[in-house]
Amino acid sequence: MMTPQVITPQQMQQILQQQVLTPQQLQVLLQQQQALMLQQQLQEFYKKQQEQLQLQLLQQQHAGKQPKEQQQQQQVATQQLAFQQQLLQMQQLQQQHLLTLQRQGLLSIQPGQPTLPLQSLAQGMIPAELQQLWKEVTGSHTADDVVCNNHSTLDLSTTCVSSTAQPKTSLLLNSQASTNGQASVLTLKRESSSHEEYTHNHPLYGHGVCKWPGCETICEDFPSFLKHLNSEHALDDRSTAQCRVQMQVVQQLELQLSKDKERLQAMMSHLHVKSTEPKASPQPLNLVSSATLSKTASEASPQSLPHTPTTPTAPLTPITQGPSVITTTSIHNVGPIRRRYSDKYNIPISSDFAQNQEFYKNAEVRPPFTYASLIRQGILESPEKQLTLNEIYNWFTRQFAYFRRNAATWKNAVRHNLSLHKCFVRVENVKGAVWTVDEMEFQKRRPQKISGSPTLIKNIQTSHAYCSPLSAALQASMAENSLPLYTTASMGNPALNSLANAIREDLNGVMEHTSSNGSDSSPGRSPMQGMHQVHVKEEPLDHDDNDGPLSLVTTANHSPDFDRDRDYEDDPVNDDME
């Protein structure tokens, strides 16, 4: 009768270090080894029982025995028979378990097959699973020692010694003996492609260097790496300590990752849910002209921007008297102001809308366009270039998540813009009343927001190429740092300094142009008097825009017919009240 093959401690270390078993295969292997170890114990116990029974028969044949000794021997024999029956029941249960695993396809038991070669085991295993495997293996041997101690009264010492004679680091891979005389072996199938993939993706080997913490030994190829791994990083105290350190590092990183995830979730919930308390506008500043001024708190507010000269040839003085600092309190009084860079200088809405279409559909962020531009875009996207009022509503809700949550507030503004803007024409046809766009009228109303000197208009239009990248950079910087506008405490910020320099340069350009215009200034006029020729056009506000971005537009020589073409969604009568 052949005995099961036992792995030496060195072979066990090689299996653990090569990381060649998957967790499922390890679990099946451990279950198989426990069953095989129990079968080995049963077989040796049977031998011992046969020897003891033969000795008892020989002892009973001797005539000089005392009756008391015979009774003790009979009791011992009875106990041994009872224990033998229990072991037989356990063996039957183990055989049933093995049959169940074989039916499930986890085990492939074939008679007469040789033992499983170590080279055929190939799948990855993490260090935590290695430690768990080691604990389970050593724990199984410890349990065997406890069984030996508990049954010492049954004269099973020989059985215990034979079952635990091997070191605790040994594993049983195969059992050639069973109750029916058939041999059983555990076979694990593996494809060669998986082995190659594992070879190239070994977590401890990359770019010809050993990735063991603190090692970084250069290995020419993967076999040399395995040789180095088995020799230098064997299962000893040093490697165990390094594994514990790595486990602590991973735990710290997981803790930090969970904290960062919570922080990110809080930031996202804060940005997507409106707060009940007043706050400064988080959206960045948008520069749309070469002459850019900040929005004042109200017409009655005396506050204005501080202007310090950036060049000695064009000194600037404050425009009005009073405090020369715009604080966040004044911004709270103003409320959020929407940026409208795409409508001021005929920047096409289609380009920005095409780039950010998915963003607008999923994020509750108000699009940076006027209602008139959005209505025009929806009509132009339709196949027939005409939409009914209900179809316009559907286009708004389909393209923008912002308009899906408060439909009753913005529909009134859409109707108001359709009625009052000349570029929208109502046509009666078979479908009913549909709306179309008069493109000439729409393009004609755009430049009316800046009138006066043609040179100033040309200067503003040509400066758009400069303002666009500058605006994008300032928006990114302001959004990243969540900067307020001009406050005394925030003037030391580098992003605000760059913003202030850009504003000063723009103002200097306006001053040079204004002072050089002979029709608007006299020789005795001071630079401060020349500045009064530049007016700030205040765009009306939407009270529902608590997070709208800021737009700053300067106009010169206010046109009398300007009010006719302003954005009517901002009228107080049709405010988007929430």
UniProtKB/Swiss-Prot annotation:
Biased composition (Polar residues): 293-305
Disordered, as annotated region: 293-325, 511-578
Gene Ontology biological process terms, A to Z: negative regulation of DNA-templated transcription; negative regulation of transcription by RNA polymerase II; regulation of transcription by RNA polymerase II
Quaternary structure annotation from Swiss-Prot or TrEMBL: Dimerization is required for DNA-binding. Isoform a, but not isoform b, interacts with ctbp1.
Region (Leucine-zipper): 250-271
Record SUPFAM superfamilies: Winged helix' DNA-binding domain
Zinc finger intervals, C2H2-type: 208-233
Protein name as it appears in the record: Forkhead box protein P1
Entry-linked SMART domains: FH (SM00339)
Chain's gene name: foxp1
Keywords: DNA-binding, Metal-binding, Nucleus, Repressor, Transcription, Transcription regulation, Zinc, Zinc-finger
Compositional bias segments (type: Acidic residues): 568-578
